[in-house]
Amino acid sequence: LSVSVVRDCENVFYSKSVDKSRDIVDCISIINGSESLYENVEAQSNYNSQYLLLCKNCIDSYYLVDCVNCTNCFLSSNLRNKEFWIRNKQSTRDEYFKEINKLNLKSRVARNILLKEFKEIKKNAIYRFANLTRCVDTTGNYLLNVKNGKNCFEVYNVENSKYCYRGFDY
């Protein structure tokens, strides 16, 4: 069962507020062409990733908070345009894949341990006041391409709106 899944979605399971995405499981607020995600929250245009929070354009990554344009990153926060990072430290391609294989991400026990570490990363990450992207004269949070909006939340591609939740051009 998924709630509020609209606009060109395929294979969305146990998720809420998903648009223009496919192969999504256990996610909330996923938009703009995301694909093959598990346990993502407030994600845009991510691919083949798990446990991402507030991330955009990330590929093949796990356990990230507020990361943008990252590829093959793991257990990190507040990264921009990075590749092969583990626990907020740069690594080589070989080191990265060696560490990932050593962690055995398919094991439920290993995942529970990583989730505890991820909880600490979320607690210590730096968060923006509001997530506004290409917005003008707008108040609210989780907004994309909004002009003249007042108290809008999870809204994108709209103009002259007030007191909206989950609004977008259709």
Where is each model-derived feature located?
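Long, distal/terminal scaffolding or interaction modules
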Residues: L1-Y170
